[in-house]
Structure formats: C-alpha cells, structure tokens
C-alpha cells in the first residue's frame, strides 16, 4: 500500500508538471482562436462578423420627397415630436428641419438634412430632400443613403412637376415608396383621385410592380394625425411610423471590407470639415486607419478621429457605427462629396455619384458701381472666387469657369432658383457682386 501510494504521488506530480506546461500553450491557443472567430480588427474572414461584439440595432433609412409647400417639413416636425425627441424642458418650435434662414423665409427646403427618431426600438433615419428641381443635385446624392421613400402629396393639388422629378430619381434607384396624401382637411380636396394620379405618375415613370404596390396613408401633418382612411382622423401619426417599420426594408449588409460613400458635408469651427454618409459594408470605429478613394482613383491614407450619429436633430459622439447607419466622420483632410471611405489594406471604391449637368449660366463680377464698398466687406475678385470655390465643395450641381476678365466668373447652375439662392447667401455674408 505504501509503495502504491508513493507511485500515485509521483504520477500526480508528473501530471501537474504536464498541465502546467500545457497551461501556457492553452491560453495562447484559445486567445488566437478567439481573435480568429471574432476578428477584432474588423475586415478579415473570421467565422462570425465582428459586429457580434456590438449590439446590432434595427435601422430604417427613409427619404421624404414632396413638391414645395405640400407639408413635408411640417410632417418631419410631427415625427420628431411623436418620437419624444425633445426633453420636457425644451421649447419645440416649427420648421425644425428648415434651419436655414432662406428656407424659413421662402418656405422651401434648399439643403438636404438628416435627423433620426427611435420608435419601438427601431432607429429611423430621416433624410429631408429639397423639393425644387433646381436643387436636384442635393436630391440625387442623398437618395443613395435611403432604402425607401415617403412620397408626400397635397390632397387638393395632387402630384406636381417637382414631385415627378424627385420621384423619378427615387424609382430609378429601386426605392419602394409609401404615399402620404397630406392636407385632407382642405375644402374640396379629392384624396382618392390624387391617389389614382400618383399611381398613373409612377406607371409613367416605369415603376416596377413592387413599387406600384405601394401603401397609402391619409392625414393632416398640421393637425398631427395620419391613418388609413381620410374620413376618420386618428389621434396621432403612429400609423405612419408603423408602416415605415413594416414596409421599408432594413439596410442590406453585404460581406466584405469597409465601404462608406460621402454624400454631404458639414462644418464646425472646432473640428473643421465633417464628412457625412452611409456605411454600406462592415463598420467604422474611432481610431481606425482607412483609405480615402478619390474620384480620380487616387488613394489617401487617413485615420478616423471622431464618429457621430444623428439623435433627433443633434449629433452624438460614438465609438462605433454599424453597417446601414448614417454617420458623420471627423478627421479626414481634403475629402470631396462622392469619395469612398474604405479599408486601408484592401481599398474598394463605390461608383461615383452622377449629377445632371447645369442648365443655365450667370456672370458673377465685382461691384464696379459708384456704390462700391458701401454694403459689403468682401469686394474683390479674389474674395468672390474663394467663396465660389468653397461653394463648389458642397454644391455638386454648380460649375464655375474663368472668363477673359479677371474680375468676372461664369457660374453654371440648375436654374434661376439655384443661382438666386447662391447670390442671396453671398450678399448676406457680406459679399458685393453684380
């Protein structure tokens, strides 16, 4: 028994030594396996997507298109309020999305803008698009961020020419529409006839069978209700929000390395220029090295300094943004609208954004009248050229050419409204021109 006990103790000691030796190997092996499975560096071929490390969020990206004064901005205001975007202490005004002075004065949307709401644990990114054809350059690029569209139509006027223009762009991109017939509280309105006109318009624009099988919502954004029957007003606009969740598809998350296209930009006096766009593949995180692929194919190495997503009307800093979401990126130098943010080691560019050519031109020159310098502070040709160059960075539908005179520039735009807004903006900023 004593000999058996001694032999057992020697065996136990040997087992302990073997286990101790294997322990270090096991830790290293398991660590390598975990890295392989989850691929922390984002962009490899692990067994599971790296996004499993984060809470995946259900997202809907929807653009709202409408003719001028059909109630689009008012509807967005109601959606923001319905989703309790504002705290009890905040004073909620009107025309929240039209925060540009000229937009409020003229009652039109000039610049495409982004906001988001949360409803039933779903994040809905709202893309507000201009309704006037002169601002089609804004429309064409921001529609690429959407997976569906709300087609807002006046119950009395029906679909108008500008509705046709924007809707044709949305249908060509394969976006599925939800038709919202607004202002059913108007006297002598004909909602059923308007719905038939919308169907005829879509058929004329070569909509697919799936696009023609659209859902219709009736209501009054001003009164704050939406429902399936215009004769029976509801209490709120939740019927519309439920339809968005049900019929607008979730963003497709294709396999592969990072791809994000810059579709608009913002500016902050603290961080400079901010790139805004949608992530089509993989994900982004703060500090991640990336490649910026330019329109001409040139590749610039860079790194993400800050990431922001939209929460209501504001931007919120985050550490990580998943595929399908719309975000703002800080830290990129020399980017342009249409550039692709992609993986640093395996850069893959997205197709460039196509914008229709300008249709008219206007001569911009210095003020050489007797009242030179009386109203503005930027009066030289250099000032005017620098301002036009700045506008070219964000206004894709604009084109500027030099003339034989150093004091005159030929500016091409999409229409009278397009160029008139630019002139008025420059005048208010202190530029003198004629």
Where is each model-derived feature located?
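Residue-identity detector for glycine
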Residues: 11, 43-46
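Polybasic, lysine-rich low-complexity intrinsically disordered segments
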Residues: 2, 17-18
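Short intrinsically disordered, low-complexity coil segments enriched in acidic
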Residues: 1-5, 434
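Structural and coupling elements of P-loop NTPases
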Residues: 30-31, 35-41, 48-434
């Amino acid at each position: 028994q004593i000999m058996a006990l001694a032999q057992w103790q020697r065996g136990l000691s040997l087992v302990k030594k073997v286990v101790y030796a294997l322990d270090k190997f096991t830790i290293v092996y398991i660590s390598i396996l975990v890295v392989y499975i989850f691929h922390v560096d984002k962009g490899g071929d692990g067994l599971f997507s790296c996004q499993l490390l984060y809470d995946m969020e259900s997202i809907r990206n929807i653009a709202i298109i409408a003719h001028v004064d059909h109630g689009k901005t008012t509807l967005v205001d109601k959606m923001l309020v319905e989703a309790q975007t504002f705290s009890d202490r905040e004073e909620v005004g009107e025309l929240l999305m039209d925060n540009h002075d000229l937009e409020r004065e003229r009652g039109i949307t000039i610049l495409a803008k982004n906001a988001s709401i949360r409803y039933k644990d779903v994040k809905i990114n709202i893309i507000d698009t201009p309704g006037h054809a002169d601002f089609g350059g804004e429309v064409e690029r921001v529609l690429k961020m959407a997976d569906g569209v709300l087609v807002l139509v006046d119950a009395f006027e029906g679909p108008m020419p500008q509705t046709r223009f924007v809707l044709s762009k949305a249908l060509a991109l394969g976006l599925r529409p939800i038709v919202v017939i607004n202002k059913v509280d108007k006297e002598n309105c004909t909602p059923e006839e308007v719905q038939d006109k919308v169907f005829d318009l879509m058929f004329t624009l070569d909509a697919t069978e799936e696009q023609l099988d659209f859902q219709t919502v009736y209501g009054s954004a001003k009164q704050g209700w939406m429902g399936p029957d215009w004769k029976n007003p509801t209490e709120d606009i939740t019927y519309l929000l439920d339809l968005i969740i049900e019929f607008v598809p979730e963003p497709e998350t294709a396999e592969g390395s990072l791809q994000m296209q810059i579709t608009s930009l913002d500016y902050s006096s603290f961080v400079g220029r901010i790139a805004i766009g949608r992530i089509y593949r993989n994900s982004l995180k703060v500090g991640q090295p990336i490649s910026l692929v330019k329109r001409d194919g040139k590749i610039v190495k860079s790194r993400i300094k800050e990431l922001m997503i939209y929460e209501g009307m504001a931007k919120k800093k985050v550490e990580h943004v998943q595929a399908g979401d719309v975000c703002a990126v800080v830290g990129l130098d020399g980017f342009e609208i249409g550039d692709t943010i992609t993986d640093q080691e395996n850069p893959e560019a997205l197709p460039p954004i196509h914008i229709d050519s300008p249709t008219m031109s206007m001569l911009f020159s210095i003020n050489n009248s007797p009242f030179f310098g009386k109203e503005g502070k930027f009066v030289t040709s250099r000032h005017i050229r620098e301002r036009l160059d700045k506008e070219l960075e964000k206004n894709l539908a604009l084109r500027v050419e030099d003339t034989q005179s150093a004091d005159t520039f030929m500016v091409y735009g999409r229409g009278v409204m397009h160029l008139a807004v630019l002139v008025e903006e420059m005048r208010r900023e202190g530029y003198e021109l004629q």
